[in-house]
Amino acid sequence: AMVTKNNGDLDKSGTECRLYCKDNSPGQNNSCKMFYSNEDEHKGMVLPGTK
């Protein structure tokens, strides 16, 4: 079962869940997903609002 992750959720080790986007350009239909910051899947993705 997929667990729905929410911004600010903490995993067992206390790592915060954040929204990562593939493209940070304004107006893009960004493909955004929630990841814990210690997960590898968000490599190459960016946090919204960061350059």
Swiss-Prot record:
E.C. code = 3.4.24.-
Q: Which segments cross the bilayer?
A: none
| Cofactor binding summary note | Binds 1 zinc ion per subunit.
Tissue specificity as recorded in UniProt: Expressed by the venom gland.
Question: Where in the numbering of this chain does the Peptidase M12B domain appear?
Answer: 1-12
**Gene Ontology MF term list:** metal ion binding; metallopeptidase activity; toxin activity
User: Where does this one sit in the cell?
Assistant: Secreted
Q: What range(s) does the Disintegrin domain occupy?
A: 13-18
Q: What are the glycosylated positions?
A: N29
- Enzyme category, top tier: hydrolase
Function, as annotated, reads: Snake venom zinc metalloproteinase-disintegrin-like that blocks the interaction between platelets and collagen fibers through its binding to collagen fibers, resulting in the blockade of collagen-mediated platelet functions such as adhesion, release reaction, thromboxane formation, and aggregation. Binds selectively to collagen type I with high affinity. Also exerts proteolytic activity to matrix.
Q: How does it assemble?
A: Monomer.
Family according to the record? Belongs to the venom metalloproteinase (M12B) family. P-III subfamily. P-IIIa sub-subfamily.
What name is this protein filed under?
A: Zinc metalloproteinase-disintegrin-like crovidisin
Could you tell me which species this protein originates from?
A: Crotalus viridis viridis (Prairie rattlesnake)
